[in-house]
C-alpha cells in the first residue's frame, strides 16, 4: 500500500510538532546543500523555530548573499517604483491627450460650421446680428477677391506691354541689319554678274548679243549694197566711149 497523503495544516500536538520540525529542517538543509552543489547556485537558508531558535545555511558567506539580496531587492523596488511613476505619467499624459483631442474636435467642428455658413448653409441657428456680421465678412471677402483679380489682370497687361516693346525693338534691329546687308551686297553683285553669266545661264544676254550681231550683219549688208550701187553708178558714168579709127595702114585703133 502506498503512503497516504498528509493533510497540510498546523500540528496541534507540541511533541509531534517538534519531531516533524526537526526532520523536515534537516531535509530542507540537505536539499539546499544539494541544490548549491548540483546547480552551482548561491543558496542561503534561515529558519526560525516556533520557540525562537535560529537555524541557517549558506553555500558562501551569508553576509555576501544578504548584501546581494538587499541590493537586488532595492533595485527591484526602485525599478518597480519607476515603472509605477511612468504608468502614472502615462495615464496623466493620456488624459491630457484625450482632453486635447476633445478640444481639437470641438475646434474642428466650429471651423466646419463657419465654413458651411460662409457657403450660405447651416444658417438656421444664427441671430440677426450674427447674420449681419456674416454679410459684412462676405462683402469684405468679395472686395478682396475683386482687388486680387484686378491686380492679376494689371500684371498681365504690363507683361504684355513689355513683351510688345521688346518685340518692336528686336524688329527694328533686324530691319536695320537687313538694310545694311542690302547696301553692302549691291555693288558686289553687279561686279560679279558678268563673270558668272554664260549663254546657257543667261538667255536674255545671249539673245541681246544675237540681236546685236544681226544688226551688225544687216548694217554690213546694207553698206555693201550701197557701195556696190554707187560703184556701178560711177562705173556707168565714167565708161569711156570707144571709137574705131582707121589709120593709114588700114587697121582699126580704138581711141577714147
UniProtKB/Swiss-Prot annotation:
Disruption phenotype: Altered expression of MIKC* MADS-controlled genes during pollen maturation. Early flowering under short-days conditions (SD) when combined with AGL15 disruption. Disulfide bonds: none annotated. Residues 222-232 have a biased composition (Polar residues). GO terms for cellular component: nucleus. Mostly expressed in pollen, roots, flowers and siliques, and to a lower extent, in stems and leaves. Expressed in the endosperm and in developing male and female gametophytes. Also present in seedlings. GO terms for molecular function: DNA-binding transcription factor activity; protein dimerization activity; RNA polymerase II transcription regulatory region sequence-specific DNA binding; transcription cis-regulatory region binding. Probable transcription factor involved in the negative regulation of flowering, probably through the photoperiodic pathway. Prevents premature flowering. Downstream regulator of a subset of the MIKC* MADS-controlled genes required during pollen maturation. This is Agamous-like MADS-box protein AGL18.
Amino acid at each position: 500500500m502506498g503512503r497516504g497523503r498528509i493533510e497540510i495544516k498546523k500540528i496541534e500536538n507540541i511533541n509531534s510538532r517538534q519531531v516533524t520540525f526537526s526532520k523536515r529542517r534537516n531535509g530542507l538543509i540537505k536539499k539546499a546543500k544539494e541544490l548549491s552543489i548540483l546547480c552551482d547556485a548561491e543558496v542561503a537558508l534561515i529558519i526560525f523555530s516556533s520557540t525562537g531558535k535560529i537555524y541557517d545555511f549558506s553555500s558562501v558567506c551569508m553576509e555576501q548573499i544578504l548584501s546581494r539580496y538587499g541590493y537586488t531587492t532595492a533595485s527591484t523596488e526602485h525599478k518597480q517604483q519607476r515603472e509605477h511613476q511612468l504608468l502614472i505619467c502615462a495615464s496623466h499624459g493620456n488624459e491630457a491627450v484625450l482632453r486635447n483631442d476633445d478640444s481639437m474636435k470641438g475646434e474642428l467642428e466650429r471651423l466646419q460650421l463657419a465654413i458651411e455658413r460662409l457657403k450660405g448653409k447651416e444658417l438656421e441657428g444664427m441671430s440677426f446680428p450674427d447674420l449681419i456680421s456674416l454679410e459684412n465678412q462676405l462683402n469684405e471677402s468679395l472686395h478682396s477677391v475683386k482687388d486680387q483679380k484686378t491686380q492679376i489682370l494689371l500684371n498681365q497687361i504690363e507683361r504684355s506691354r513689355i513683351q510688345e516693346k521688346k518685340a518692336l525693338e528686336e524688329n527694328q534691329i533686324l530691319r536695320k541689319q537687313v538694310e545694311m546687308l542690302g547696301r553692302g551686297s549691291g555693288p558686289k553683285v553687279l561686279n560679279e554678274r558678268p563673270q558668272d553669266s554664260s549663254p546657257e545661264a543667261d538667255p536674255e544676254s545671249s539673245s541681246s548679243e544675237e540681236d546685236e550681231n544681226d544688226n551688225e550683219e544687216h548694217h554690213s549688208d546694207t553698206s555693201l549694197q550701197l557701195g556696190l550701187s554707187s560703184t556701178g553708178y560711177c562705173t556707168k558714168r565714167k565708161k569711156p566711149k570707144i571709137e574705131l579709127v582707121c589709120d593709114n595702114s588700114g587697121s582699126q585703133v580704138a581711141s577714147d
